[in-house]
Amino acid sequence: MPYQLENRPPDLRESMYFPEIIRGIGTITKHFLKNLFFSRDANPDILARKRGGFGHSDNVTLQYPEERAPYAPAYRGLHRLVPREDGKPRCVACYMCATICPAQCIYIEAAEYPDDPVEKYPAKFVIDELRCIVCGFCVEACPKDAIRMDSGEHTPPSYERSAQIWDEKRLLRGPPVSYQYDPWLRRGSPSIPPDKLEEMRARAKPFPTVATDEASQTPGFSVRALAAEAKDRAQAARK
Amino acid sequence: MNRFFGMLLVIAATLAGLVLLSAGFYLAAGWLGWGFNALTGWISGSPGVSRAAVYYGASVANVVTLLLVVLMISSSLLTVAERKWSALIQNRIGANRIKVFGSALGGIPFLAADALKMLTKERIETTGRTRVLYELAPMLAFAPVFALFAIIPVGQGIELNQIPGLAGAAAAGAVEQIALQVSRTDTGLLYLFAIASLQVYGTALAGWASNNKLALLGGVRASSQMISYEVSLGLSLVGTMIAYRTLRLEEMVVAQGTPVLGPVPALGLLLQPIGFLIFFASAFAETKRAPFDLPEGESEIVGYFVEYSGMKFGLLFLAEFAEIVVLAGVITAVFLGGWHPILFEGWLRQNLTPFWFAAVGAGAFIAKMIVMMWLQLTIRWLLPRFRFDQIQKLCWKLLLPAALVNVFVTGGALLLDPSGQLLAWIGILTIVVIAVLTAAVGRAPAPAAGHGAAHAAAGH
């Protein structure tokens, strides 16, 4: 919180320097001794770290390669094309994401399944990760929940720019998702074998109304697990 | 809590190690002194005890143990300590990426990495430099510091036959006492002032011989700053000379062990608190470190050493840390009671052999030195640097008059009461006044974070 300091010349005590310096040494020594004698809380979540009180150092350092701060549930990571249970993309090549993308980094070529007269699929689905501004509009625009940024990963670095052009083969990954309202589940599809269809219907669930449910499906990342951990921590602290 | 007990253990082990180290130093001094005596006796063909031979032999041993071990090791460790301690002050971890068997060992392995880097770096030499002076400057910066440590009385004198293994060597009083002090000169503090004033040549020449405007500016700033502060440095110690009636540092230390007010010993800090503050500030300015680091300034002039690279820069850099060690040694000897372990001193003196009491004393001296080094590094991380005019104003308008007043007050008090009790009371009064001034709240505290404060913020 910035506040205005009165601009006045130093009084006698301040112009003697020594009293103020001794006070400063006291403040610094407090930090020094606390950090010398007490260890860091190992919790990598800096905001949740115990510090400052007696028995804990004031240290805020995160030893990066070994310790990593967990990302927030809303973290927008690398895109993925969400697969169906049968391994095909949920995407129906409607161009919504390519249309809303302010950086125009999504390129889609639509195609039709040879045995299914209704459904389309993306023959090509290319995202130029170098142009992507990570705004997340594509995820918002998608009517089929077919593109997500829930991977919790950064775009991996590469030596060639061409390696940053991600096509549908690399984008299609992560856990499959099925919803009860999915049209291919309700009406069936010739491209899906009947027993597979039954399995997909069995695993389909209602569309989520709570935002955190989606994030909880991120591989390697779970809001529920985090919440449980925080609860455990709080309970341990109360004891 | 594990770290808490570990740290207590480390501190206890360090103290015990210092005592054992000092015992080793005494052994080295005693044995080398006696060996030197035997050697000269064998060469000259006249067996017997020679005062000078024992003294010279002990001095040679002390050069090795005190100058090369205590001074050099601690000043090189300070380069690591500066990083590690500043990290502790600023709530960081500090240098810890070099690991030996999985342990960072408090960052100490960085010492080896630094030395390797300095020694293997490319030497870049400017064409316009004045060759002789350019090469001479790092040596001139380093040598006086080294010479200064020669008169620091790290350990008290004990008789030669009190050292283990030398019981039958020479009767007490037959030869010079063995002390952990390279040179016991009558000139004492005068030698200190003389050598300390040589320090300015290293920096001034480094700036001048580099043929670089910025380096020259750094050198000129260094000269004006160091020459100014030499005046208050000298005057601040005049009070202690009057109080202890001697110039010799070892006699000052002995005098500080005598009780003056009941059981309270006549520490320099007690008799001369103002002298201590002035000496500390002036000597801090002599070390050219923050807040007095005007000779170097990365944002304006780079510094007097801008044209130096590799180990030549390393020597200039190490000289500053060696100055810290020497300053810590002088303050310990003159103001903090030197080798007197203050606490439990009578009990220790009664229950230990003279040899081990001396070793404990020398360990206490080094421990006090470490505290003073820590204090200097703390102040370096506490304060922003002064402006140049503020530096001169602080010296000529504050420190110098205060030092002069201190000299007259000390002289007057001792004239009225030669036992020093009046001086001690004046010292206690001064300390109380400083403590009250420190505790009193000066500036108004920051306004409470509320709506009013938000309105005061710029741009609101």
From Swiss-Prot, chain A:
Q: Report domain 4Fe-4S ferredoxin-type positions.
A: 81-111, 123-152
> Highest taxon of the source?
Bacteria
**PROSITE patterns from the xrefs?**
4FE4S_FER_1 (PS00198), 4FE4S_FER_2 (PS51379)
Q: What does the cofactor section's free text say about binding?
A: Binds 2 [4Fe-4S] clusters per subunit.
Please indicate if the UniProt record lists Repeat as a keyword.
yes
Task: Give the reaction(s) catalysed.
Answer: a quinone + NADH + 5 H(+)(in) = a quinol + NAD(+) + 4 H(+)(out)
**UniProt KW keywords:** 4Fe-4S, Cell inner membrane, Cell membrane, Iron, Iron-sulfur, Membrane, Metal-binding, NAD, Quinone, Repeat, Translocase, Ubiquinone
Q: Where, in this chain's numbering, is [4Fe-4S] cluster 2 bound? A: 101, 132, 135, 138
Amino-acid biosynthesis is among the record's keywords? no
According to the record's subunit comment, the protein's assembly and interactions are:
NDH-1 is composed of 14 different subunits. Subunits NuoA, H, J, K, L, M, N constitute the membrane sector of the complex.
| Full protein name | NADH-quinone oxidoreductase subunit I 1
Species assigned in the record = Anaeromyxobacter dehalogenans (strain 2CP-C)
Q: Which gene encodes it?
A: nuoI1
